[in-house]
Structures are given as C-alpha cells and as structure tokens.
Amino acid sequence: MPLLSGLYNEQSWRCFLLRWLIFGVLLSASWYVHPLFSLCCFVPYFVTLFRHKANGAWYLQLFILNLTWNAAVTYWLCQLDVVRGSGALLVNSVLFLLPVILWRLYVRYGRIRHGQALALLLWWILFEYAHHLWDFSWTWLTVGNVFGKAPQLVLWYSWVGVMGGSAWILTGNYLLYQLGKRSWQTQKAYVALMVIALPIALSTGWWLLKQPNAAAPEKDITAIATTMGGTDEISDREKMLIVDSLATCDKKPKGITLLPEVLLSDDVWLNRFPLGDLYAGLKHGIRSWHTDNIIVGALLNVPDAEGLHVEERMALQQHYSRYNAALMINASDTLSLKLKKVYVPLAEYVPSYLSFLHLKTYGFAKDPYNTNHFDIDGKKYFIGICYEVVNSLFITQSLKENTNAILMLSSESFFGESETGRQQYMNICRLRALENSLPLVKSSNDGIVMAVTARGELQEAKRTVRPYVMHAAIRLSVPSCYHVVAKYLPYFLMALLGLLLVLSVCFRETFAIAFEAGRLQLHRE
C-alpha cells in the first residue's frame, strides 16, 4: 500500500508531513468525533518515535507532533490569552519530550534489547503520574481523559483509573503500529484486536447487565447556576439578592444547596465574615430557601504574618493570605471551611520560588492540612473546587474510605467564550465520578451545572445562559478500589523498570556464555 509505505518511511520529511497530517486528523477525531479514534491515532507518533537514529531532527519531529497534540485539544487557551496560551502549548509540548528522553537514556545505558516498548509505556505512565503532583500540573492531556465522552466503554477505570486507560490506549496503538510495520500478519492482528476490543466488550456488558444499587441511600442536592462570570463588576450583595430570589421562589425542600465558586469576592475575611450581613443573609436562607445546608464559594482573606498580600487600614499594614474557599453554613454556629489546594498553573498560583517573575495572578495560597470533606447528616462529601477535579490523583488520594459523594463548586469564567473548553471540562469531571465510583454534582458561575452518577452517566446537565436551579437526587456510594491502587502505582511501575534491567543483565550474561561455548566448540572442531 503506497500510503502505508509512505507512513512508515523513516527518512523523508515529506513522509513525516504525511504522518503529521494523519496524526492531527485522527487525534482531533478522537476528541471531537468519538474517543475510539484514540485507539489508532498514535500510530503515526510511534512510527516517528521508534526510529533507530535519535538526532536533532528526530526530537524536532516529536516536538512538532507534541505541539499538534496540545494545539488540537487545548487550542482554546490561545482564545483566552494569545501570549499565555501559546506559551502553555509550547512548554507542555517540551514537557511531553521528557518521558521519551528518560526512555532513551534508560534503554541506552541499561543496554535494554528486549522490552523497549514496555519500558516506554512504563516511563510514559510514570510521567503522567508525576505530572499530577507538582506545582505546574496540567493533566488535561492525560491520554485516558479522551474517553470522557463515552464512559460506558471504560467502566474499568474504577479499578485502574484514567492512567490505566492511558496504558490501554498506548498499548493498542503500539500493536497496530507493529501490524502495519509487518504488513498486517493475521495472527498478530488477532492479538491486537483482542487487546483493543476485550476491555470495551467487558465494559459494555457491565454497563448493560449490572444495574446501580437501588438500595443505596439518596440525597437531594440543589445546584444553582448564577451566570455571573468571575470578572463581572457586581457586588456580593447584588449577587446574593439574585441567588436569594432564585432559591426563595423554589419551594422544593433542599438537603444541600450548592452555590458556585468565588461567588463571594468583596473583601471577605475569615475573622469578620461571621459578623457581617452576608453571613446573616445566608443564615436566614436556611429557613427561606427550605434547605438544611448552604455551601458557597468565596475569595477568603486570612490574616497571616507571612502572607503575600497587604491590607492598609488606619495607617496600619496587615499581611494576609488569600484562599479560594468553600464555606458551609447551616443551623449550627460552626462555619465549615474547605480551602482549594490545586490551582491552574501561573494563572491562579505562582510558587514562591518564582515570585521574582512578578506575574499577574490571583496570588492564592495553599494549606495542605485543611480538610477536603464536609460531614452532613452522618455522610461525608468530598468538596472539589473547580480545577481540583481535573487532577485525578488529587481526588482519589484525598478520598476517605467512607466518602459518599463529590460536590463541585466551579466558576468556568476561565473559559471565556470557549464552549469547547467547557465541554471537555464536563467530560473530564465525568471520569472523576466514574473512576472513584462516586456521584458528582457541580454548580457553576458561568458554565454547565450537572449531576453525574457513579458510573459517569449524565443524570442532569444544562449549559446555563440565565440563572438556573437544578435539583438532583443522587444515590450515595463509597470509593472504588482505584483510590487504593493509585497509592502503589508508582512503586509498581518502578519495580517493573528495575525488573527489566535485571532481566536485561541476565540475558546478556546468558548470551555471552552461549556465545563463548559455541566459539569453543567451533575451535575444537
């Protein structure tokens, strides 16, 4: 086949252009048409990757493919801010070279002759794992996230998580790459087909045959969408008047009322808030809204001698830290507080070691010891604030054995006019519900309000253009085994890499002994 031979030609830049075009088309189709395209879209990438000669042109070609990948999926970053968006695409494309560089060094200095593809897979999943943990985590492009549009095909994410999905997708692509390289041998084709199709068949059967537990307890959650973007110049008092009119007119009893992220943003201080009018209005809302609990997002200022921000009142300066927080108000006199811990890199949070850059940012602080759960009526609810829920590892490692649901406060004003970003965000959140087997309810300032079942199904979803109240009766659950598996995943991957090194040494010694024995035998003859 001329097209296939052109795709596998290793020398010509013209053939690389063909691979680049096919890669871009298939990758875009996997995100915007159907995620099943992801099971073949990386074949052109592997054709380039497994060239024997690694030189400057090779790294340049991989960088171009990485940039195409980033741009095809998150092009909307440039719609929000051309300079920062372009910088993010370029930096992330360079970062995606890191697992390849580590793999090349590992193969070269470990003298790995067998299992090179397995080593690449292990390094790639380790990279995805590490990319979840540092200050500049941008986990949007974790390969397994592509199946957010069709969670019914990957119900087994509740066992191995989204990174298990990455391993499956990359393995399927590698097998197809080998098939094309060897002219589609029938026996190899059966193996590739089984690897690709069996997980889908098992997941589909599970979806059809195993119904949700009808005996599980339910909880009524009311999520309110305000359609007030984070940049709207409107006072907190006016915002609460709008919310109050919505919630008061809705006469249905509410177990939990979930308001959006950073709804309160006008000079909200932790030590003054319980004494102010906004708090009094929310306490009054417990009765007038027919609800038992109100969870609201706030830009919260906390006095802190080492804080980055300074307030000047009556000629006195006070340092403070600013947090993106969720507050829970109910009939008790206790104010429950959850502080956001995972931020959009640079836009929301700049590490202290980069403070010399003086970047324009919200300047949020972190408190890793603050709770992530609210206890309501004997049940535990994980509180996720916007970008936190994109991070698979943060969610699963923060859950407790008796967590019953995920409640999300989001703004989505970050996406501006980009509906593509909002849709991707919604689908990624669906995977967080699926891989942890927990229902998820999401409020929003300027986006999609939704309720998701523990299997990732959309129970309710609405892109709001005017203030909206959504009611959802969610079926409470408990975390899947993934939150246990995730703790040991890096140790398992590193153990396999170590085992490959040991086996490589054993093979070399065995080969050397066999070669020497053969040479002596020939010498005797």
Predicted segments, located by residue:
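CN hydrolase (nitrilase-like) catalytic-core segments centered on the catalytic cysteine
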Residues: L121, V262-L264, R272-V296, S355, ...
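Active-site catalytic loop in hydrolytic enzyme cores
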Residues: Q79-D81, A130-V162, A280, A315-T396, ...
